[in-house]
């Protein structure tokens, strides 16, 4: 099949067989796994995954690709022709392993969507822009550390596994990519009931990165509150750990 990648779907198809083999080794698919592939494309990962699995669920929006996959992998592949951003992953049960070469144009909102189902997930392995992965795994007091780091690290432990060069794709993207492994925390750092407050407060904290917390969180905390939390209000948002943001969230919830 000659499929022209569609820009509106952010399609870049993986074609490097050495890289594909490395990714499959990292994922380590096993018979009995309840595995889901998001954006299978022309099956670069699909076939080697199926070689190790009893069945594979695939989520693909492009109708032409769905037709191709249906013809070539009908026996063990279950295809959902839907937008992954709107898909209810709880419909597939629990103990899920999710993989995929995620479309670059929806990767961040899709990660936030998937985080809602973290209690049903064993692990996730995704191909993403390298700069996105670096932001996901970033630590405090580094340039890449920000809201994305905190929101995802609250739910997942994450590790950058492999850098994938642009020439491994057709067409080559303008950026490097990387494989990230995400494993849900047994218990999120922020309780589920406080995540909305946590997200709003973190958004405010990073709204002006060069300003101090005294300014960015002035609608949430007084100097007395900072003293009680033992946090220097002269610090910037990037200087605080997830645990410190957790303490701030709980404190705000208590005093409201």
Curated annotation (Swiss-Prot):
GO molecular function, one term: RNA binding
Catalysed reactions, as listed in the record: adenosine(1518)/adenosine(1519) in 16S rRNA + 4 S-adenosyl-L-methionine = N(6)-dimethyladenosine(1518)/N(6)-dimethyladenosine(1519) in 16S rRNA + 4 S-adenosyl-L-homocysteine + 4 H(+)
SMART domains: rADc (SM00650)
EC code: 2.1.1.182
The keyword Membrane belongs to this UniProt entry's keyword annotation: no
Top-level lineage group: Bacteria
Entry keyword annotation includes Cytoplasm: yes
Top-rank EC class of the record's enzyme: transferase
Localisation: Cytoplasm
This protein's UniProt keywords: Cytoplasm, Methyltransferase, RNA-binding, rRNA processing, S-adenosyl-L-methionine, Transferase
PANTHER family referenced in this protein's UniProt entry, alphabetically: DIMETHYLADENOSINE TRANSFERASE (PTHR11727), DIMETHYLADENOSINE TRANSFERASE-RELATED (PTHR11727:SF7)
Function: Specifically dimethylates two adjacent adenosines (A1518 and A1519) in the loop of a conserved hairpin near the 3'-end of 16S rRNA in the 30S particle. May play a critical role in biogenesis of 30S subunits.
Protein's recorded name: Ribosomal RNA small subunit methyltransferase A
Upper classification of the organism: Bacteria, Pseudomonadati, Pseudomonadota, Betaproteobacteria, Nitrosomonadales
